[in-house]
Swiss-Prot record:
Role noted for this protein: Acts as a negative regulator of hedgehog signaling probably by promoting internalization and subsequent degradation of smoothened protein (SMO) present in the ciliary membrane. Plays a role in sonic hedgehog (SHH)-induced spinal neural progenitor cells differentiation.
Classification of source organism: Eukaryota, Metazoa, Chordata, Craniata, Vertebrata
GO terms under biological process: cell differentiation; embryonic limb morphogenesis; embryonic skeletal system development; gene expression; heart development; in utero embryonic development; left/right pattern formation; lung development
PANTHER family: MODULATOR OF SMOOTHENED PROTEIN (PTHR31186:SF1)
Protein name (database record): Modulator of smoothened protein
Length: 167
């Protein structure tokens, strides 16, 4: 197993962890209002009213966000399989070729999720339009983690494909 394979494996693992954290954290969209802060995630929606304890419930997702969640979960599975194949490539060199293609599939799934997610900004809790959030609403830390997972997946693919050679 060469250094580039190890580097790409670490990048894929980091992307996998960031994607899992983005789903687990309910901060994809944040209203940040002082009276009642609302954070909307793909698996939980949390609200804090006038300094009381934060209350979380499962959200009613629009079809666009269900599709986004599906693509992210499939991308996570792809990156997990990729990491396993990169470990297996220590004994069977041809596993690297399959790992690259599965990681590429994961990247496509993540990019599709990133394109589809903003279409769901029209829901009542957010109050925006497709691809346009209202002025008082911002994307939260979960979305940033998800974008980082896309970035690490792309850089990992560059190393796995030996496109990005050091020195």
């Amino acid at each position: 197993m060469d250094k580039l394979t190890i580097i790409s494996g670490c990048l894929f693992l980091a992307a996998d962890i960031f994607a899992i954290a983005s789903i687990a954290n309910p901060d994809w969209i944040n209203t940040g209002e002082s009276a009642g802060a609302l954070t909307v995630g793909l698996v939980r929606q949390c609200q804090t009213i006038h300094g009381r304890d934060r209350t979380c419930i499962p959200p009613r997702l629009p079809p666009e966000w269900v599709t986004t969640l599906f693509f992210i979960i499939m991308g996570i599975i792809s990156l997990t399989v990729t990491c396993g194949l990169l470990v297996a490539s220590h004994w069977r060199r041809e596993a690297t070729k399959y790992a690259r293609w599965i990681a590429f599939t994961g990247m496509i799934l993540f990019c599709m999720a990133a394109l589809i997610f903003p279409i769901g900004f029209y829901i009542n809790e957010v109050g925006g339009q497709p691809y346009k959030l209202p002025n008082n609403t911002v994307v939260g830390s979960s979305y940033v983690l998800f974008v980082l997972s896309i970035f690490f997946t792309i850089v990992g693919l560059l190393f796995a494909g030996k496109v990005c050679l050091p020195g």
